[in-house]
């Protein structure tokens, strides 16, 4: 009888150790390759034109270094057959972009499996502790084995992290037109904590302007920003150039 209990205990402990790291192992396998996705909030339709000159104004107000981004966008635009010029007055198109944020983000709506992984480790600890019911003669020792099994799962989960970096960029495209374009600008300027000043202005020009937001995601297990940065920049450059 005692031998049977010991065999059952060994089998249960072995199963717990095997299962405790299953969440981490599953994550490591599924997310071993870098996945990059880019989405544009609005489609921009430009009129067909024979003019092929583009002026670029690329800004970065995030806390990450994006010093090479303008060069990548310029290369992508040139690859589409356009000429990048330094004078806005000589350009048929203007491309203005600002990187608002480039950081690790928790996309809870699509990555709920991360929380379930941690729950798996805790369940492993509780299951291991329950072995005491099979061996009342050494409850303390068996409890220690069960908790150790759970801690193995927690340690495995801690070593495997599903990381998603997101880059958010606002983009404005302007194209010249033969028509006269009248633009009314309205701005609400805050005055202290309880007031605001409404400022309006009207200008006349020869450009149609369009705005959109580009969101790029890089996802991989234990991903570092240094690895995510170049692919995020490449995806943004490709997305912007494909508007033309």
UniProtKB/Swiss-Prot annotation:
Cellular compartments annotated: Cell outer membrane
Membrane topology label: Lipid-anchor
Segment forming the signal sequence: 1-21
GO CC annotations, alphabetized: cell outer membrane
Sites of N-palmitoyl cysteine lipidation: 22
Residues linked to a lipid group, S-diacylglycerol cysteine type: 22
InterPro entries: TraT_complement-R
Keyword field: Cell outer membrane, Conjugation, Lipoprotein, Membrane, Palmitate, Plasmid, Signal
Main localization of the protein described in the UniProt heading: membrane
Keyword Transferase among UniProt keywords: no
Function: Responsible for preventing unproductive conjugation between bacteria carrying like plasmids.
Similarity comment text for this entry: Belongs to the TraT lipoprotein family.
Name this protein carries in UniProt: TraT complement resistance protein
Gene from which this protein is expressed: traT
């Amino acid at each position: 009888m005692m031998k049977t209990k010991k065999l059952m205990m060994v089998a249960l402990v072995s199963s717990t150790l095997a299962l405790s790291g299953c969440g981490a192992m599953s994550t490591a396998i599924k997310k071993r390759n870098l996945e990059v996705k880019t989405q544009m909030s609005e489609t921009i339709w430009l009129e067909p034109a024979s003019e092929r000159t583009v002026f670029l104004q690329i800004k970065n107000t995030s806390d990450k270094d994006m010093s090479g981004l303008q060069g990548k966008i310029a290369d992508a635009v040139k690859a589409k057959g356009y000429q990048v010029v330094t004078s806005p007055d000589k350009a048929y198109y203007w491309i203005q972009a600002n990187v608002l944020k480039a950081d690790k983000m928790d996309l809870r709506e699509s990555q709920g499996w991360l929380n379930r992984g941690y729950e798996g480790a805790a369940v492993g600890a509780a299951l291991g502790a329950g072995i005491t019911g099979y061996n009342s003669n050494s409850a303390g020792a068996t409890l220690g084995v069960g908790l150790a099994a759970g801690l193995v799962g927690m340690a495995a989960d801690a070593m495997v992290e599903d990381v998603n970096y997101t880059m958010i960029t606002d983009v404005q495209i302007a194209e010249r037109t033969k028509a006269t374009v009248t633009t009314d600008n309205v701005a609400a300027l805050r005055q202290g904590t309880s007031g605001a000043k409404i400022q309006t202005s009207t200008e006349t020009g020869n450009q149609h302007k369009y705005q959109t937001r580009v969101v790029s995601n890089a996802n991989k297990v234990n991903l570092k920003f240094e690895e995510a940065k170049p692919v995020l920049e490449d995806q943004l450059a490709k997305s912007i150039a494909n508007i033309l």
